[in-house]
């Protein structure tokens, strides 16, 4: 099947690429790469240094030359201090110590009393520094000549440098990565699984508020969340930041130690009332504005011991008030100072439990916090939520999650979408204030694992073709669970990570296997119900989503719209008008996905299909029952090819899905999603169906 791509689309894409490259070049140049300064070894990123395990390098320019000091190890160390003329002058350096510092576990030594001849070449501080060195070295058989070339190169970031040593006697070069002294240094702390008022939430809330202050200007404090946490990636991402982003982490063990470490970032404290749960949510708003931490009365002595001043005491002030009254009071008092680009719904669990994982990000951005009901029947809270959202800037982010006690996900996303805004969940989203400051590698390009090239065809046979998409794939999903990479599998991409947490997005792309295929989600540039969006605002949301699709090399886009109820008590179908907006707004997409549970919208335009899910794999469904379900769907949909799209809930892993697929028999074939979509566009056997509005 040939896919027609207009010259206009090609030109637009080329223009975007050129703009991205130009901006990257300007940004890189503006960051002033230079070798001068003090550098420390990133030991996990290069060749091991025998015995010493550490290396510091100091580089400075002086009249007609340079000073270079290499220090191997610490107290039991070796220092090589050189003052050299540049421009190819032969500098003679006497050998005063027999230590061969890069490889002390090899039987080599320097002949004391001899000389090293070093020629230095260095045009300017940003250019590589090259040293050509000749000397003798002693082995067990006597002297041998040795030629070495040392190259110090700044980049790819201003705080990184590579140092390579090529020797005439060694086949492979020695390579080190160093970072500027004091850069990429952070602390981490393992959080306890305590989220109940009176049983540990007080400490957790304090620490998360401290994180929001500590990370305001740089990535300084990272938390490893317990295994039960919604987002299960905090341990491997910590390893990634250490091993690939070259962070050095110091472990913190107690709240007192954490406060001592980051006290300079704290201007005071806000006291919340343990008898009024909502007061903690309000306290996060105030604390973000006042650069304060949130504490209950048990932590006040620690504040006093550290000389911190009280900014607000909510004890007794909100007793007996409804949530609507509390949030109206808070908004009247603080709303004008809060961000119009970010707002936090600190919902989720209720009662005496709260899991405020995203609070650090909200505080960092001076966001207003609430858990207002978005259910129309709760008129007072709903009306206040509606008024607050109406004051937000276009395309602003509504982060966190709805209250499980007050309303439903569909209520929350519908109201947000009706204002042309976008949701990014959840309330448990961890470490965003840290990850936001960790940049992707300069020049990193997002590459999806496409299985079929632009303009290529895929002709189906008389089979049942199955393709699987994992919900919340890179966040709550099975990314770190067994089986990933064993079968073709598609994953929803949290597209806003491209700017909210760019290194996180790089992490997922760089750890993807050839069988992992990414799809854009969900309904817009974030979580959006397009049917609920005002008609004049939908094109702008789609255009923003398309920008991220292009950046992230995504060719399939997923829509989910529960604005008119679920599959059973309402509908999740799309109107022809809404589908048309995506077809026209995303001309580079090869196809679209619709639904969560099974949905019933199907279409093809220019061989680009819109396919709804035909099956939802419940985490509680046994493998045998799932196989029976899929066989029955194939019997009902008897024409071949039959395109059976499966949505996998985040609680299932790939190994389980593979086991189900393996039991289906020879009439079924698992297809990569892009191949599946291409085949469905080439030979659709589904009937066109749209939601008809009366």
Indicate residue ranges for each PLM-predicted region.
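Hydrophobic small-molecule pocket/channel-lining residues, especially in calycin-type beta-barrels
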Residues: 31-182
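Bacterial N-terminal signal peptides that target proteins for export
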Residues: 2-18
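Short, hydrophobic/proline-enriched secondary-structure or compact coil segments at domain edges
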Residues: 62-74, 161-165, 263-278, 394-405, ...
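Mature N-terminal, pre-catalytic/accessory segment of carbohydrate-active enzymes
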Residues: 181-334
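Catalytic grooves of carbohydrate-active enzymes
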Residues: 383-393, 397-400, 459-478, 484-486, ...
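Non-catalytic propeptide/linker segments at domain boundaries
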Residues: 360-484
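Acidic-and-aromatic substrate-binding clefts and catalytic sites of carbohydrate-active enzymes
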Residues: 194-207, 212-216, 221-234, 240-241, ...
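Metal-dependent polysaccharide deacetylase catalytic core of the NodB/CE4 family, i.e.
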Residues: 184, 219, 272-360, 364-370, ...
């Amino acid at each position: 099947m040939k896919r027609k791509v207009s010259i206009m689309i090609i030109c637009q894409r080329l223009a975007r690429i050129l703009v991205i490259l130009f901006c990257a070049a300007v940004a890189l140049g503006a960051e002033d790469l230079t070798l001068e300064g003090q550098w420390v070894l990133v030991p996990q990123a290069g060749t091991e240094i025998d015995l010493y395990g550490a290396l510091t390098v100091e580089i400075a320019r002086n009249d007609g030359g340079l000073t270079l000091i290499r220090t191997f190890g610490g107290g039991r160390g070796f220092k090589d201090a050189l003052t050299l003329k540049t421009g190819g002058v032969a500098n003679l350096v006497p050998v005063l110590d027999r230590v061969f510092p890069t490889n002390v576990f090899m039987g080599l030594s320097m002949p004391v009393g001899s000389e090293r001849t070093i020629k230095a070449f260095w045009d300017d501080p940003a250019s590589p520094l090259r040293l050509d060195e000749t000397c003798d070295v002693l082995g067990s058989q006597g002297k041998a000549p040795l030629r070495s070339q040392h190259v110090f190169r700044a980049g790819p970031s201003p705080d990184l440098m590579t140092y390579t040593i090529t020797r005439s006697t060694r086949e492979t070069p020695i390579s080190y990565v160093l970072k500027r002294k004091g850069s990429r240094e952070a602390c981490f702390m393992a959080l306890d699984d305590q989220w109940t008022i009176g049983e540990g939430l007080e400490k957790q809330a304090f620490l998360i508020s401290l994180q929001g202050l500590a990370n305001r200007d740089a990535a300084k404090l990272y938390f490893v969340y317990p295994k039960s946490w919604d987002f299960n990636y905090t341990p491997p991402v910590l390893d990634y930041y250490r091993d690939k982003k070259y962070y050095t982490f110091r472990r913190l063990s107690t709240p007192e130690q954490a406060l001592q470490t980051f006290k300079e970032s704290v201007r005071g404290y806000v006291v919340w009332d343990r008898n009024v749960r909502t007061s903690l949510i309000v306290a996060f708003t105030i604390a973000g504005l006042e650069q304060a931490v949130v504490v209950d009365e048990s932590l006040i002595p620690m504040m006093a011991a550290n000389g911190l001043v009280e900014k607000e005491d909510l004890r007794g002030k909100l007793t007996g008030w409804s949530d609507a009254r509390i949030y109206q009071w808070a908004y009247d008092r603080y709303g004008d100072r809060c961000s119009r680009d970010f707002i936090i719904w600190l919902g989720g669990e209720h009662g005496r439990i709260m899991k405020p994982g995203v609070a650090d990000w909200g505080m960092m951005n001076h966001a207003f916090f609430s858990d207002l009901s978005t259910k129309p029947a709760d008129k007072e809270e709903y009306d206040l939520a509606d008024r607050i959202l109406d004051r937000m800037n276009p395309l602003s982010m509504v982060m966190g999650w709805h209250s499980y006690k007050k309303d439903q996900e569909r209520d929350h996303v519908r109201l947000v979408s009706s204002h042309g805004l976008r949701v990014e969940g959840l309330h448990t989203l961890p470490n965003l204030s840290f990850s936001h400051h960790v940049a992707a590698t300069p020049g990193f390009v997002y590459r999806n694992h496409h299985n079929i090239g632009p303009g290529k065809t895929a002709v189906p046979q008389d089979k049942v073709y199955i393709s699987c998409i994992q919900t919340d794939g890179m966040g709550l999903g099975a990314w770190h669970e067994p089986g990933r990479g064993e079968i073709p599998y598609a994953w929803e991409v949290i597209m806003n990570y491209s700017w909210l947490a760019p290194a996180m997005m790089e992490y997922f792309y760089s750890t993807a296997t050839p069988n992992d295929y990414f799809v854009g989600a969900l309904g817009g540039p974030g979580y959006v119900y397009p049917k609920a969006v005002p008609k004049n605002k939908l094109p702008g949301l789609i255009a923003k989503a398309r920008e991220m699709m292009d950046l992230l090399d995504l060719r399939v886009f997923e829509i989910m719209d529960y604005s008119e109820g679920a599959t059973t008590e309402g509908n999740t179908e799309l109107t022809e008008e809404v589908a048309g907006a995506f077809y026209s707004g995303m001309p580079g997409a090869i196809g679209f996905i619709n639904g969560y549970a099974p949905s019933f919208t199907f279409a093809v335009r220019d061989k680009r299909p819109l396919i709804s899910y035909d099956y939802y794999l419940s985490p509680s469904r046994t493998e045998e029952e799932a196989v029976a379900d899929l066989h029955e769907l194939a019997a009902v949909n008897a024409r071949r090819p039959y395109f059976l799209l499966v949505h996998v809930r985040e609680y299932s892993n790939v190994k389980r899905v593979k086991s189900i697929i393996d039991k289906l028999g020879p009439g079924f074939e698992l297809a990569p999603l892009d191949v599946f979509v291409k085949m469905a566009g080439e030979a659709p056997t589904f009937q066109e169906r749209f939601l008809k509005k009366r």
